[in-house]
Regions:
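Short alpha-helical transmembrane segments in multi-pass integral membrane proteins
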Residues: 1-22, 80-145, 191-245, 301-368, ...
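Short runs within selected transmembrane alpha-helices of multi-pass transporters and secretion channels
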Residues: 73, 141-160, 168-176, 197-212, ...
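Transmembrane alpha-helix boundary and packing residues in multipass membrane permease domains
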Residues: 25, 29, 41, 78, ...
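Small-residue-rich hydrophobic transmembrane alpha-helices
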Residues: 52-112, 149-168, 262, 276-339, ...
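Interfacial/gating helices of multi-pass transporter permease domains
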Residues: 43-63, 129-134, 194-195, 236-243, ...
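Residue-level signal for short hydrophobic patches within transmembrane helices
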Residues: 11, 15-34, 38, 61-68, ...
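Helix-terminus/linker motif at the lipid-water interface of multi-pass membrane proteins
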Residues: 30, 34-53, 122-129, 185-192, ...
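Transmembrane helical elements of multi-pass membrane transporters/channels
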Residues: 20-39, 141, 152, 175, ...
Length: 456
């Protein structure tokens, strides 16, 4: 195994190892966001505001599909990380074999569900008639090739589960650049329309998947299963499926709530849809360090769970929380002053109504980012500890809250109700996750071990 690329999360100082592991994930996430942002910028500049709104109207559905595949990949990676922490390489190979089989089956299921329900779902979301056709063209391309997204997330999740977050980075950077080039070529030269933005994204993700597999085969072949490892192990398949579906469903529940919320946004017209789209893209970028630190905590907690180091899990939890809160405070101040410029740039518009509403969304929601930072850390730590139900409970709180806002608040509060919806729900979710995490036996044990240690 390539030790130079693999970060040791079980031994040594926590802060350097956590940052070394998290930084490549951060860069990977940045370039992953560039897939979507390139679509927004290029579509907005070359196809116009109506096409931009068509892409924006599918954001929640896109997040639902991609979030599910990413969640499944990361969830199964948690199981592999636990075996890696225990240095059980035979079990790792058996787990990898099982993830490939399960990933292929889930890809087929998601694709069939998409084919059957995509157009009715867009209609249910009150997608404006003038952009409905373009929205369907864009998102149907993503759904058709959902297996590509599954493949990449499974391979990348495998590398990250063993502490190798650097390997996939170079592949993803290359693919992001290819995505931008293809976007420009398909739209400006071939004039293929809005669906070509989805095609460019799929081709780019496919390149990432192929390069990830090639790297694993050449550099860490000990992770690849042989034919003998493709065997039925009920307990292993159940563990992988439960953990993968738990994280996939958690992402899906969040996205379903976003889909419901998007239905309210769509009723405000194309200008508000464009404002919301631009603001959400900016939000996704500025939250990347927080989501990266919390995602790193999942692997960190899982590996140290396998190594039986509860004290180290608690130390990592404290360090991760401080890092995440610090970034959240910085972003809150930054967005308060820079939101109008950023929204105008990303939406490719100087429309005062659009810029005002997009800026208001960012300025209000960012005030709650410190709370969101703890929410993400607590939830990912619970997932790393193998908890499946408690993180799901927080997602159901979010879903119920968004339904309540759509039914009771937004009809009379207007777009300001949309803006306040998620921040207020974050507060309730964080309270539930706090008590769930700090009542966990391993966290209590870790705190007791640290309390008995003599400070050096």
């Amino acid at each position: 195994m390539n030790k130079k690329r693999t970060v040791d999360l079980i031994h040594g100082p926590i802060l350097p190892s956590l940052l070394s592991f998290a930084f490549p994930i951060l860069l990977s996430n940045i370039f992953q966001q560039l897939y979507n942002t390139a679509d927004v910028l290029i579509v907005g500049r070359f196809l116009g505001q109506e096409s931009l709104a068509a892409v924006g109207a599918t954001t929640a559905i896109f997040d639902l599909i991609v979030g599910f595949t990413l969640g499944v990949g990361n969830g199964m990676g948690i199981v592999i990380a636990r075996y890696y922490g225990a240095r059980n390489f035979i079990k790792i190979k058996e787990a990898v074999a099982a993830t490939w089989i399960l990933g292929a089956l889930l890809s087929i299921v998601v694709m069939l569900m998409g084919f059957l329900g995509l157009y009715p779902l867009l209609q249910y979301l009150d997608t404006p008639a003038e952009i409905l056709s373009q929205s369907y063209q864009y998102i149907s391309m993503i759904v058709t090739c959902v297996g590509v997204s599954f493949a990449y997330n499974l391979f990348a999740g495998l590398l990250r589960s063993i502490g190798d977050s650097l390997a996939a980075l170079g592949f993803l950077i290359f693919s992001a650049l290819v995505n931008v080039v293809l976007d420009l070529y398909f739209i400006t030269q071939l004039h293929l329309g809005v669906q070509s933005a989805g095609l460019a994204t799929i081709i780019s993700q496919g390149l990432s998947a192929v390069l990830c597999f090639y790297y694993i085969r050449r550099s860490v072949p000990e992770l690849l299963p042989q034919l003998k490892h493709f065997k039925w192990d009920k307990a292993l398949y159940a563990d992988l499926l439960e953990q993968g579906l738990a994280m996939g469903l958690m992402s899906s529940i969040v996205s379903i709530g976003s889909v419901i919320l998007q239905s309210s946004v769509n009723t405000f017209g194309a200008v508000i849809i464009s404002a919301q789209t631009a603001a959400r893209r900016i939000m996704a970028f500025v939250l990347l360090p927080m989501t990266t630190i919390s995602a790193s905590m999942t692997t960190f907690a899982s590996q140290n769970l396998g190594a039986k180091r509860p004290d180290r899990i608690v130390q990592g939890l404290r360090i991760g929380s401080r890092l995440s809160i610090s970034w959240a405070v910085f972003v809150c101040v930054f967005l308060f002053f820079s939101s109008p410029v950023l929204v105008s740039f990303l939406a490719s518009s100087t429309d005062s109504y659009l810029v005002e509403n997009g800026s208001l969304y960012l300025q209000i929601s960012s005030a709650f980012y410190p709370i969101l930072s703890l929410l993400l850390i607590y939830r990912n730590c619970l997932q790393g500890l193998g908890q499946k139900i408690l993180p799901l409970v927080s997602s159901f709180i979010e879903l119920i809250g968004e339904i309540a806002f759509v039914v009771l608040i937004i009809p009379w509060a207007g777009y300001k109700g949309v803006i306040l919806c998620e921040p207020l729900i974050w507060v309730a979710m964080t309270i539930q996750l706090y008590f769930s995490l700090f009542r966990h036996p391993l966290i209590k044990e870790g705190k007791e071990i640290l309390a008995t240690k003599v400070p050096s």
